């Protein structure tokens, strides 16, 4: 575990004093590792904590960077910065996938490149840094990667779901209706199929590793469909 700590510390510029918390942050649920109380040890609890820490630090960073913006604009920026794809891309940047501890089946099925695994493990790593090193160290880590992303946003982004809702309101149509079509895959690596329906434009579906992302993808597909139909 010391060698793992040494290797990852060179990338994230933080060295853990508690090796066990680092190992927990990098352990995929597929390992089925148990502690002395026969409880499964994986990154899921730390992921829960890391998600909250990331949201807090990103919110504070945006508050400082954009002093003139209203809450709504800041919220749009934050939503984009803490979404699954953004977190997974940061995980790719630091090559976190190569450090995730998983069973052979998960690894052979592309687990090290799975976007949901990358998202979850990075959130867990953030939670672990917070526990091991406190707020100052975790802020340093998050700001190192997220501040440049925040500064790169010239304007608050408009997510597809919001754009689709505004389009229906503008055209005096009922609001979009989202429906979970099906959920497949194991509990630790699910895939959700979500459909969205717009009156006069039918229904489209999209799949993703989370309901939120699937809804955004479905909304994006519906906007494309509306654009094509409108141009006919």
Curated annotation (Swiss-Prot):
Residues 159-228 form the DRBM domain. Residues 5-134 form the RNase III domain. It is an enzyme of class 3 (hydrolase). It comes from the Bacteria. GO terms for biological process: mRNA processing; regulation of gene expression; rRNA processing; tRNA processing. Mg(2+) binds at residues 47, 120, 123. GO terms for cellular component: cytoplasm. Belongs to the ribonuclease III family. Homodimer. PANTHER family: RIBONUCLEASE 3, RIBONUCLEASE III. Digests double-stranded RNA. Involved in the processing of primary rRNA transcript to yield the immediate precursors to the large and small rRNAs (23S and 16S). Processes some mRNAs, and tRNAs when they are encoded in the rRNA operon. Processes pre-crRNA and tracrRNA of type II CRISPR loci if present in the organism. This is Ribonuclease 3.
């Amino acid at each position: 575990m010391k060698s793992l700590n040494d290797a990852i510390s060179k990338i994230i510029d933080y060295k853990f004093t508690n090796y066990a918390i680092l190992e927990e942050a990098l352990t995929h649920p597929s390992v089925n590792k148990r502690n002395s109380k026969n409880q499964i040890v994986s990154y899921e609890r730390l992921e829960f904590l890391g998600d909250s820490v990331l949201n807090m630090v990103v919110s504070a960073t945006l508050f400082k960077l954009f002093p003139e913006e209203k809450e709504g604009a800041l919220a749009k920026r934050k939503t984009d910065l803490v979404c699954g794809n953004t977190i997974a891309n940061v995980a790719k940047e630091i090559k976190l996938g190569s450090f995730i501890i998983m069973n052979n089946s998960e690894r052979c099925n592309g687990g090290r490149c799975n976007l949901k695994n990358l998202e979850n493990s990075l959130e867990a790593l953030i939670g672990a840094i917070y526990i091991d090193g406190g707020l100052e160290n975790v802020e340093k880590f998050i700001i190192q990667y997220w501040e440049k992303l925040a500064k790169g946003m010239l304007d608050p982004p408009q997510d597809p779901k919001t754009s689709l809702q505004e389009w229906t309101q503008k055209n005096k149509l009922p609001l979009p209706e989202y429906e979970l079509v099906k959920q497949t895959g194991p509990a630790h690596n699910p895939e959700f199929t979500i459909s969205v329906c717009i009156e006069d434009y039918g229904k489209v579906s999209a799949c993703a590793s989370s309901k939120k992302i699937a809804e955004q993808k479905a909304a994006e597909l519906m906007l494309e469909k509306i654009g094509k139909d409108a141009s006919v």
